[in-house]
From Swiss-Prot:
PANTHER family in the cross-refs: LIPOYLTRANSFERASE 2, MITOCHONDRIAL-RELATED, OCTANOYLTRANSFERASE
Site description Lowers pKa of active site Cys, residues in chain: 150
Main location, first listed in the record: cytoplasm
Listed pathway(s): Protein modification; protein lipoylation via endogenous pathway; protein N(6)-(lipoyl)lysine from octanoyl-[acyl-carrier-protein]: step 1/2
Functional summary from the UniProt entry: Catalyzes the transfer of endogenously produced octanoic acid from octanoyl-acyl-carrier-protein onto the lipoyl domains of lipoate-dependent enzymes. Lipoyl-ACP can also act as a substrate although octanoyl-ACP is likely to be the physiological substrate.
Subcellular location, record wording: Cytoplasm
Name this polypeptide is given: Octanoyltransferase
InterPro entries assigned to the protein according to its UniProt record, in alphabetical order: aa-tRNA-synth_II/BPL/LPL (IPR045864), BPL_LPL_catalytic (IPR004143), Octanoyltransferase (IPR000544), Octanoyltransferase_CS (IPR020605)
SUPFAM superfamilies given in the database record: Class II aaRS and biotin synthetases
Active site: 184 (acyl-thioester intermediate)
Pfam families: LplA-B_cat (PF21948)
Binding site for substrate: 69-76, 153-155, 166-168
Native source species: Bdellovibrio bacteriovorus (strain ATCC 15356 / DSM 50701 / NCIMB 9529 / HD100)
Transmembrane intervals: none
């Protein structure tokens, strides 16, 4: 159902992107639009969600932004593709009724899983029965995993029944990413990139096109 409006913001500071998200949330609510699908990339920044705990950020020396999304602390940076669906949850979609959040999250994560399949990878969404070898008892179970490694972090917020925030997908390897924090409550070693998993250079444009096509089909 390709009725979302797609925008690619390119490289954009997190604060500016958050303001633009908030503006789109108001637009979707006021005009009763289906929503927007936004792709972008951020300079290095750590965001802390509503469930962040003491000790999640312990030696990160870059900018930190408090946000209203669910989940805990995570990193955003140039090695990632960040995806922000600004979605009107009051509109019924295939696979979910109106004003349902968890079914939306599953569809969102499963779309990322579907794209990973095209790279020969078997991903699984975070609330499945699959468990990491890392201790998950006190960690955030959202996101997309390949075996016991996490390739995508997912956290959303909802205001006026419009979903915003979204996912950060690790595409290329950056040894400095996630240092000084426990992303989503896990040790930083749990995070992995598409480049590491495939052992090949990632065509970012190709990945973006695949994910854009899939998300516009299912959201």
């Amino acid at each position: 159902m390709a009725d979302l409006i797609f925008q690619d913001w390119g490289l954009i500071n997190y604060d500016e992107a958050l303001k633009k998200q908030n503006d789109l949330v108001e637009k979707v609510h006021t005009e009763d639009l289906p929503g927007f699908l936004v792709f972008c990339t951020h300079p290095p920044v750590v965001t802390v969600g509503r469930a962040t705990q003491a000790g999640d950020v312990f030696s990160w020396n870059g900018p930190v932004v408090e946000v209203t999304r669910g989940g805990r602390a995570t990193y955003h940076g140039p090695s990632q593709l960040v995806v922000y669906p600004i979605l009107n949850l009051a509109h019924v979609r295939k696979g979910r009724k109106d004003r349902e959040i968890n079914p939306y999250l599953k569809v969102f994560e499963d779309a990322i899983v579907d794209v990973l399949k095209t790279y020969g990878l078997t991903g699984i969404e975070g609330r499945s029965s699959a468990k990491s070898s890392f201790n998950r008892a006190d960690a955030d179970d959202t996101g997309v995993w390949v075996n016991d490694l996490k390739i995508a972090s997912v956290g959303v917020g909802v205001r006026k029944w419009v979903a915003f925030h979204g996912a950060a997908i690790n595409l290329t390897f950056d040894e400095k990413a996630f240092l000084g924090l426990r992303p989503c409550g896990f040790p930083s070693e749990v995070m992995v990139s598409l480049e590491q998993l495939t052992g090949a250079k990632v065509d970012v444009g190709e990945f973006k096109e695949k994910l854009k096509r899939r998300l516009l089909e299912v959201l």
